[in-house]
Amino acid sequence: MIRAALVLLVRIYQRLVSPLLPPACRFYPSCSAYAVTALQRHGALRGSWLTVRRLCRCHPFHAGGVDPVPELTPKR
């Protein structure tokens, strides 16, 4: 439920806010696409943490590049 709400917020940002701004993300996939994938793959808590870490790296002094969402690690 929380995961779906967070994904919805990112989707709203993608549809309403992002088109008004110039492209600025230094990574592939974009930070918002990364957020959706991270939330869907890892859930609300870990997906949010991964998204915050990614957003903190998205600045002019970081090289950027390809930065995929980590795969789920199997539990022992």
From Swiss-Prot:
Its main location: membrane. It is a peripheral membrane protein. GO terms for cellular component: plasma membrane. Keywords: Cell inner membrane, Cell membrane, Membrane. It comes from the Bacteria. It is found in: Cell inner membrane. HAMAP family: UPF0161_YidD. Belongs to the UPF0161 family. PANTHER family: MEMBRANE PROTEIN INSERTION EFFICIENCY FACTOR-RELATED (PTHR33383:SF1). Could be involved in insertion of integral membrane proteins into the membrane. This is Putative membrane protein insertion efficiency factor.
